[in-house]
Amino acid sequence: MAVSLGASSRRRTAKLRRHVRVRKKVAGTPSRPRLVVTRSSRHIYAQVIDDVAGHTLASASTLDVSLRGGEGDKTEQARKVGALVAERAKAAGIAAVVFDRGGRTYSGRIAALADAARGNGLDF
């Protein structure tokens, strides 16, 4: 007897498959750390991680004091987070990163954050 999955289970399973596939290919090094983007329904978070040492080198999110208040829609907030994480990464001496979208599709808020980080000097 075959059990069919509901729509939300299929989406969750597809996200998990994408996440595993991306993480097999993407790893951060000290010279080129990983830019990880995590998204919830309300907030977006970005971290620059050196996987060898296991340390976060720079981070930004919509929960930061400088970004709190929610000016604009969620896509505009993602752009601000991308610009802020790029600024903090450059201050930490990081010019190039590898992008880890965390199993999310490259569209909407994920793409807005990535484009803003690229526009503010991060190379990926």
Curated annotation (Swiss-Prot):
GO terms for cellular component: cytosolic large ribosomal subunit. GO terms for biological process: translation. One of its GO terms (molecular function) is structural constituent of ribosome. The keyword Ribonucleoprotein applies. Keywords: Ribonucleoprotein, Ribosomal protein, RNA-binding, rRNA-binding. InterPro entries: Ribosomal_uL18_bac-type (IPR004389), Ribosomal_uL18_bac/euk (IPR005484). It comes from the Bacteria. This is one of the proteins that bind and probably mediate the attachment of the 5S RNA into the large ribosomal subunit, where it forms part of the central protuberance. Belongs to the universal ribosomal protein uL18 family. Part of the 50S ribosomal subunit; part of the 5S rRNA/L5/L18/L25 subcomplex. Contacts the 5S and 23S rRNAs. This is Large ribosomal subunit protein uL18. It comes from Frankia casuarinae (strain DSM 45818 / CECT 9043 / HFP020203 / CcI3).
